Amino acid sequence: MNTIPKKNVDLIIPVYNEEEIIKHTHARICAVIDKLPYQFTLYYVNDGSNDRTSTLLNELNDSRINLIELSRNFGHQAALTAGIDASKAEIIISMDGDGQHPPEMLQEMIELVIQGYDIVQTQRIDKYQPSSLKKKTSSLFYKLINKMSNTKIVQGTADFRAMSRQAVDALKEMHEYHGVLRGMIAWTGFSTIILPYQPDERSGGVSKYSLRKMLSLATDAIFSFSLVPLYIGLSFGGLLLFLALAELTYVLSFWIRGETSTLAPGWSSLMFIILIVAGLQMILIGFIGVYIGYIFQEVKRRPVYLVKKD
C-alpha cells in the first residue's frame, strides 16, 4: 500500500540568553509536534548568547534540531533571517524561544497554509496589560507606520507566523540590511489570514527587547517603508518660503506708503527667525542623513548575519 509522504515543516526559533527556559520551551513544542502528522525540523538560531543556551540545546539530543550559531548578537530580525535562509520545507513557521508564542496553535497554522494561505500571521491580543507603556508605544508605532507608508501592517502582529514555500522564496529575494520582516512580508502581498492569539507568560528569564531595541526597530520600519520624513522637509521648506514672502510683502508695504521710519529694528524677532530656520534645517538635514546612512550600509553589501562554523 502506497503511503502519502508527510509534509515537511520547519520551525525557526531565535534564542538569546534563554538558559532558564529553553528546555521547557523545547519540551512544550515537542508535546505538540509529536502528535502531528508532519515531518518537523527545528532551526534554533543562537543569536550570540553568552550563557549556557547553546550547551543546553546540544544536550537535548533531538535529531530534529538544527542549531545555527551566529558569531555574535546580530539582533532578532537577523536571527530570524538566518533561520529562514536555512529552511527548506514546504511550510515554515517562525516563533520566539521565550515561551510566549503558544505552540498549541501550530496545527491550526499549518492547516491554514495547506488550505491555500501563503501567510498565516498571528495578532497579539494582550488583555492583561491594557495600560502598559509597551502596549501604548506599540500602538503608536503601528498608527504612525500605517499613516506614513503604503505598506499596511496590522497592529499587534508578531514574528509568530507560518509561510508557504512561495512566500519564503519571495522574502529571500529581498536583501535588506535593515530588514523589518513584518513589513517586508506585508509588502509581498501574498494571500494572508490573521490569527489572533493570547500570549503566554514567560516561564523564566527576562525580555531581551529593550526600549533601545524597540526604538531601533521602529526607526528601521519608518525609514525603510516611508519617504514621509522627506516630504515633511519639503512642506516645512514651502511654509518658510511662504512666511518669507509674507514678510517681504509686509516690509514693501511700508516703503510704498513712505512710512519706513515706523519700522522697528527688530533684532530679537530676526534672531528668533534665524534660530527657527537653522533648527529646521538641521532637522531636515538629519532626515536626509539617515536615508543616506541607510543607503551607505546597503551598498556595502555586508551580510545581515555571520554563522560560526564548528
Show which residues each predicted segment covers.
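Acceptor/aglycone-binding surface of glycosyltransferases and processive sugar-polymer synthases
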Residues: 70-72, 76-86, 100-184, 200-219
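Short aromatic/hydrophobic "clamp" motif used to bind/position activated sugar donors
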Residues: 92
